[in-house]
Amino acid sequence: MPSKTLSDFKDRLLKPSPKRSEKSPATKHTLPAAFAFFLISIFIPLERAFWQGIIARRRELYPHVNFDHLCFADVLRICIQTIFLAFFTALPVRDFWQFNPLARFIRAVIRLVGRIGDSIGRLGGRIIFNIGANVVKSRRRVGRKQVSKFQNSIFWAAGIVAGLLAILCITQPFNVQGQVVFLSIVLLSAWSLTHIKARISLMLLFVLSVTVSGRYLWWRYTSTIHADGAISLFLSCLLLAAETYAFIVMVLGYFQVCWPLDRRPKRLPADRSTWPTVDIFIPTYNESLEVIKPTVFAAKNLDWPEDKINVYILDDGSRDWVEDFAKAAGVHYIKRDEHNHAKAGNINNAMKLTSGEFITIYDCDHVPSSDFLTSTVGWLVHDKKIALVQTPHHFYSPDPFEKNLHLDRAMPFENSLFHDYIQKGNDTWNAVMFCGSNAVMRRSALEEIGGIAVETVTEDAHTSLKLNRRGWKSACISKPLASGLSTESLSAHIGQRIRWARGMIQIFRLDNPLLKKGLTLPQRLCFMNAMIHFLHGLPRIIFLLAPLPYMFFDIYVIYATAAAIFAYVIPHMVHAAITNQQLQRGYRYPFLGGVYETVLSWYILLPTTVALIFPHKGKFNVTAKGMTIDKKYVDWHIATPVLILMVLNLLGLAIGIYKTVTAADPQVSTLIINIAWIAYNLLVLGAAFAVAVEEIMEHPLPRVPLKAGAVVTTSDGTKHAVSVVEFSQTELVLDMKGLAADESVVIEMTGNGHTDTFKATVAREAKGFTEFDLVFESVEDEIRFNRQTFAREGHWGDKFDSHVDDRFITGFLRLVGFAAYGFKSLVEFLPGTAGRFVRYVVSFLPRMPKASVGL
């Protein structure tokens, strides 16, 4: 006889739903449920204790089955899920890894290789330390003035020798077996170098990566092009051209950052009366007051003598309310009658009306800390040939990638690689690029080149190129001294990148750094790499489509055996991945670079192509900032190209699996290679689609973490010393509890050499903290609050989160998670009949239980 558990289960299944109306009789529910129970009981002995335990945990084990409203299809869902649970959760992964002999052998090999790598790393570290010590002694002997010549001679000599050896290694012919042996040795060397924490080890990784990738490219040019018809030849050459482009960008990138310069602020003279005059330019066009306010107030709070600083709002929108705000805030207001040349024209117009020795430019959403000028102007005073000091662009609101992929706050943002690392490499070669904001410029240098460049839509990069061509120096301070608003939506983000891509290609055509006079060779290479980087649209699309001709039409784009492909392609990819991981560690998470490029590739393809042919076409578009998103949705307009590529790759995957099952043995290995390629493409495309799923913005004004203390005085006079958690323009979140809603308090904060108090009311208690609404009675109150928060000295450089695991395998697993979220969102949001059909089919797929289960 069935137990009470089984009886209760049967009663619940056959019980009519209380939500059914008279027009929907209970039989519509009970008949399918009864039939389902009958079918299940035929195949499964439900009366046994094991299955009674399953029944008791049915909602946990079968999360996609609604046991209150069973239907005929649920029989199949339950059967599929049961098989899945039996095969994939019967033995926990930990037990498999611990008791399986093969797994134990693999683990032992990994430990052995790890010990060898650690030993080599320690030995290499000692050798490199001794080399470094000798170099330091040599520097002391040759003297300070001769150090740069000594370093340059060593660098160029080593570079020439390494280049000759690399050419020899690249062109030396090997058979497949010899290639495997050679690259195994190189791979072991590269892996060992990752254990050595020294700059020279990274340079050696560059050499190995260029050698392996160069050898792959040599093999591609000499052995894999087969004229088996015009279409096959065209597709082969197209892929080879894309790979050549990627190789060139990779080599230039290695050169750019081979010896980054971590420049620190230069101390100003102790006598503040000798400090130079500075004009602060804040250009604006159509931004809201909420966007402009923090920047203007922070400019007012800059640590600089009052008689030597002037703040100007440059309003290209000619709005009366902006002029009124400028008067209330105590800053200057400039507008112009003719609105030509967009932002560049706006700044050039202001230059005619001002006279400061130096000019500082902030986009109207970029908020500086109070020490911005004291940390940057020192270099301009110290070296009269420096025309530009650029600081990193950081952002206090999440960009679409952070927001929509739910990235940890500790993970580097999309721009971090360029602003925090590549710019240091540019500084080594005197090729720092002006980024349009968060920079100080020498007025006389700008006047010498005719002001900000107006010939292209990326006036900032073009201006720095012109300055370098005239012999002026540029520098960057690696310390974050300002932070801004990210683009809130993916469409706005793409619009901004389209302008950047178009502008850089315009410079490439109109003022090519390789052809014009006045630049050193390293400067030419740095600027060239920055420009051709934005040509990645077509190569990226080619890589996403390359395996499909073979799947659809049996057309070879790489004419080679599977063994040769493994011997050449895999080492090329692995070395590039290892080197980039070491190069970008702390500045970009593994595999996210491919996702960034995939999202943008379709959209920058046409603008860059047009700019190559018609460089004078295109106009400046203002990036939208300060918008809000109050509902989760998929931006189908933006996601359509990714969706098309996903469908094509899914079709290719299905055809590939079918061919693998039915093909002759010699073709299987080639099919497996193409299937693996398509599978990786689908991971990248799935993650790219996930970025198009716009998440809700929790707060109308972005909240910013802050490390600071505060004293709260409640209505009864009690004082509480607390910590600040985060803030916005009108809110403050403190680490305290127990206050009544709407209670009036006074909050005291100390920072930047001042103690300020603010009135506030308790808004709510949430997540263990108390949120306060600030009560500002004047503009001066807002300026003082800005001084304690946005403009707080050193604030933008604070680190708030622990380190994020950025190992290679962790990055790949995270990519898989992003892709899974993207495909899940596609199923969830796909509209119309197609969406309903896909969701119905997907409902049969098994899924992991809601909790860890061992059957």
Task: Go through each PLM region and give its residues.
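Structured alpha-helical
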Residues: 632-855
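A conserved acidic beta->alpha catalytic loop
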Residues: 315-322, 338-339
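N-terminal membrane-anchoring/stem segments of glycan-assembly enzymes
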Residues: 2-272, 536-543, 666, 671-694, ...
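Membrane-embedded multi-pass helical conduit in multi-pass membrane proteins
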Residues: 177-181, 185-242, 533-619, 634-700
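The conserved acidic donor/metal-binding loop of glycosyltransferases
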Residues: 363-367
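Short, acidic, metal-binding catalytic loop of nucleotide-sugar glycosyltransferases
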Residues: 297-308
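Cell-envelope/extracellular polymer assembly enzymes that use nucleotide-activated donors
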Residues: 277-279, 310, 462
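Long helical/loop segments within the catalytic core of UDP-sugar-dependent glycosyltransferases
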Residues: 256, 334-358, 369-457, 468-469, ...
